[in-house]
């Protein structure tokens, strides 16, 4: 049986918390599609193509991981791909409320849709891509919060190395 799930997100940038969820997802599913959301209402630091490349480099050559992107509703993307399962990471109880509402809306739009929630490890429960961006933009050190290739990309994008 080929069990697959979609792990959607903006991944702007990819964090070690995201990587931890990918690893947990691979323990639950045979295949994982990491789907980068293209949201025209946001002003991302990295383009969709840059984010996809950073994710590919960070996950290495694992054949169980596919990196893709989508526009619009994630549930429509899931329907198009024929993968009605989504993997979501939870950092705190506050994440659950939003994710619970989203899961129920997705289920309403696509009845066969299932959401699978996994907790982020204790090392990364406080890490969000938004906080990483803010800290990096102000010259703070985000080493250990993002993969090495993402740290280098942040430094290039911002034109300076982070403070120690």
From Swiss-Prot:
It is found in: Cytoplasm. Pathway: Cofactor biosynthesis; coenzyme A biosynthesis; CoA from (R)-pantothenate: step 4/5. Substrate binds at residues 10, 42, 74, 88. It catalyses: (R)-4'-phosphopantetheine + ATP + H(+) = 3'-dephospho-CoA + diphosphate. It is an enzyme of class 2 (transferase). GO terms for molecular function: ATP binding; pantetheine-phosphate adenylyltransferase activity. Its EC number is 2.7.7.3. The keyword Cell wall biogenesis/degradation does not apply. It comes from the Bacteria. The record marks 18 as: Transition state stabilizer. Its cofactor is Mg(2+). Homohexamer. This is Phosphopantetheine adenylyltransferase. The gene is coaD.
């Amino acid at each position: 049986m080929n069990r697959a799930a979609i792990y959607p997100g903006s991944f702007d940038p990819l964090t070690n918390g995201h990587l931890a969820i990918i690893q947990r997802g691979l323990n639950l599913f045979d295949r994982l599609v990491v789907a980068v959301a293209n949201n025209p209402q946001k002003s991302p630091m990295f383009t969709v193509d840059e984010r996809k490349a950073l994710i590919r480099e960070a996950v290495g050559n694992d054949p169980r991981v596919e990196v893709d992107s989508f526009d619009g509703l994630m549930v429509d993307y899931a329907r198009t791909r024929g993968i009605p399962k989504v993997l979501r990471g939870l950092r705190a109880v506050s994440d659950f409320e939003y994710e619970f509402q989203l899961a129920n809306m997705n289920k309403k739009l696509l009845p066969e849709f299932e959401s699978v929630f996994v907790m982020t490890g204790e090392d990364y429960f406080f890490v969000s891509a938004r906080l990483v961006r803010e800290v990096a933009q102000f010259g703070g050190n985000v080493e250990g919060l993002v993969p090495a290739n993402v740290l280098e990309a942040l430094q290039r994008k911002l034109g300076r190395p982070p403070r120690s």
